Amino acid sequence: MPSLKDLAKECGVSVATVSKALNDQPDIAAATRERIRAAARRMGYLPNAAARALKTNRTYNLGVLFVDERQSGLTHEYFSAVLDSFKVEAEQRGYDITFINHNISGRSMTYLEHCHYRSVDGVVIACVNFYDPQVVELVNSDVPVVTIDHVFNNRMAVLSDNVAGLKALVKQAWACGHRRIAFIHGEKTSVTENRIAGFYQACEELGLEIPEEYVRDGVYHDVERCAEETRALLALPQRPTCIIFP
């Protein structure tokens, strides 16, 4: 693999000039920068990750904390799309991705310890128990964090509009002629609370009176639990004509 010295010799410039061109420093002519970069591409030059980390104070390594209790993994119908988009954007910007977990080569460690061990530049947290002490520890640490569908006061978050989503779903059911609409929701999270709020808001706007027994506690991605709650709804004297599932 060619080195900075090889590139410098090929282009007839100093190693310092090559370094400036590859690191997009401003004090170098645009034509020289492009000539050096073209030579780097032609020669197959790749920067040394350790050297780049020392120079830029970045590892270009991002962590992903994804804990799916239902073990659907990367086939999760929602988060798989989120993580795939994240992967594409990260790769386009030259970042690698590390999945954060508890066990490294047989050694148990906290999420924060794993982040420090891998020297990640930041972490995306998705599909976890946000009240887990280890998650709270990570969020409150010096590691930059972005959370998905959960808000911590001092951290950046990317949110779905769960209120509007459920309202649209209820109104679509209403437009199809349904007036007895039930809702089996997931376990207690901020996402669930917003969806329940959207459900009741839509029902109120449509003038629908929803019996208390029409709103059931379920578990996300738990088919058996959903089937159990569905049977309970269908056993009611006046059963719903439409059921919204988690």
Which residue stretches match the model-derived regions?
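N-terminal helix-turn-helix DNA-binding module of bacterial transcription factors
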Residues: 1-60
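Short beta-strand-centered segments that line the small-molecule binding cleft or hinge
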Residues: 108-164
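Short hydrophobic segments within beta-strands
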Residues: 65, 100, 126, 183-184, ...
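Amphipathic helical "hinge" segments at domain boundaries
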Residues: 45-109, 200
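Bacterial carbohydrate/catabolite-sensing allosteric modules
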Residues: 1, 10, 42, 85-93, ...
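Short hydrophobic/charged patches on amphipathic alpha-helices used for structural packing
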Residues: 51, 111-112, 135, 170, ...
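Residues at secondary-structure transition points
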Residues: 2, 27, 31, 49, ...
